[in-house]
Amino acid sequence: MKRAILIVLDGVGIGELPDAAKYNDEGSNTLVNTAKALGGLSLPNMGKMGLSNIEEIPGTPKEDNPIAFYGKMAEASPGKDSTTGHWEIAGLILDRPFPVYPNGFPKEVIEAFEKAIGRKVIGNKPASGTEIIKELGEYHMKTGYPIVYTSADSVFQIAAHEEVIPVEELYRMCEIARNILQGEHAVARVIARPFTGSPGNFYRTPRRKDFSLPPFKATLLDYLKENNYDVIGVGKIEDLFAGRGLTLSLHQDNNSEGIKNIFEAWNKLREGLIFVNLVDFDMLYGHRNDPEGMGKALKDFDDALPDIMKLLSDFDLLIITADHGNDPTTPSTDHSREYVPLLIYSPNFKRTFPLGIRSTFSDLGKTLADFFNVKNDLHGESFLSTIEEGWK
């Protein structure tokens, strides 16, 4: 029986990539800089796995005999967003980044969208979703104009009050936007952001829905599903892959629910992969430049690790990595172009080795495809033979 849990700590990078300057990310190191800002960060369980052997994290000592294989991975695709990172982990490398809109969407996009939905839009700028409904919610209620906004990610977001634009109508608008946003403006995701409440007290409802660009060719998830493995997505995995290649999806509102979902997914897994995204590091702390929050979230995850590790049988795998950086100590509130950590654990490892610096996140996807013994056309170079040495 082959089983693996792959956990992506969203935004938890481990040092600038050689091309970081092109992205204005020189000096970014999410893990190390967070630890420095806090005067040290104790992550004993990831420490035992070899986290500080990748790059020393102040407060987490290096381990003489790490219980996991450890290394770091470079991103071969251009860009530094979640979709790019997760697709590359799953074996796809992009040749151009998804478009982002730091100054809002161009006139031709907005005009085409307004014409198609038969009403004007307001906003059209990068913004925090909670802030923009505070700012424009009342005007939206008076006019019925939907609020369009973006973020540092490649997203076209539409916010609307549920009593002004019913949710099904909002979803229809998102489908229209998805059809318009193709070619040079093919954003990774169009997102419906319904809200309710009254001026001064607006709040978002759980009926958010993502309209994602599907991966342009088969990913690890597709190959596993085709070969009758279970592929369970936890968190925003379903959104990032447009629902493709999954046999079940579990969603959550925060990391602690996400960790509970790992246990629920494990109980449902016969044989296959649980692919987990824990987003709080990025969404709540990286984008808000909150190193204290980032540190606490990392400690909370580290505290939960022993119970996750106890789930595994002798030849199961637990993999911990990230999709990009989001250094909370830099002036930027955007993602950062960083290496990501790579820790691979199995309870029956007799010995472990460094995995070095992998030239693409796809090495991980290729290795997992090999582990599950599925024929594939993924990018990357498998290091399964190295991992198998651990069981000998």
UniProtKB/Swiss-Prot annotation:
Cofactor binding note of this UniProt entry: Binds 2 manganese ions.
Protein name as catalogued: Phosphopentomutase
Catalytic activity annotated for this protein? 2-deoxy-alpha-D-ribose 1-phosphate = 2-deoxy-D-ribose 5-phosphate; alpha-D-ribose 1-phosphate = D-ribose 5-phosphate
**Per UniProt, where does Mn(2+) 1 bind?**
D10, D323, H324
Its top-level enzyme class, in one word, is isomerase
The protein's required cofactor(s) are namely: Mn(2+)
Give UniProt keywords alphabetically.
Answer: Cytoplasm, Isomerase, Manganese, Metal-binding
Gene3D superfamilies registered for this protein in UniProt: Alkaline Phosphatase, subunit A, Phosphopentomutase
Query: Which pathway does it operate in?
Result: Carbohydrate degradation; 2-deoxy-D-ribose 1-phosphate degradation; D-glyceraldehyde 3-phosphate and acetaldehyde from 2-deoxy-alpha-D-ribose 1-phosphate: step 1/2
One family from Pfam that matches here is Metalloenzyme
User: What is the primary gene name for this protein?
Assistant: deoB
A molecular function (GO) term: manganese ion binding
According to the lineage, what is the superkingdom?
A: Bacteria
Its Enzyme Commission number(s) read 5.4.2.7
Task: Quote the cellular component terms of the Gene Ontology held in the record.
Answer: cytosol
Q: Which species does this protein come from?
A: Dictyoglomus thermophilum (strain ATCC 35947 / DSM 3960 / H-6-12)
Please state which protein family the record places this protein in: Belongs to the phosphopentomutase family.
Q: Which residues bind Mn(2+) 2?
A: D282, H287, H335
Per its UniProt record, what PANTHER family does this chain match?
A: PHOSPHOPENTOMUTASE
User: Quick one: a GO biological-process term for this protein?
Assistant: 5-phosphoribose 1-diphosphate biosynthetic process
Q: What does this protein do?
A: Isomerase that catalyzes the conversion of deoxy-ribose 1-phosphate (dRib-1-P) and ribose 1-phosphate (Rib-1-P) to deoxy-ribose 5-phosphate (dRib-5-P) and ribose 5-phosphate (Rib-5-P), respectively.
Keyword Isomerase in annotation: yes
- Where in the cell does this protein reside? Cytoplasm
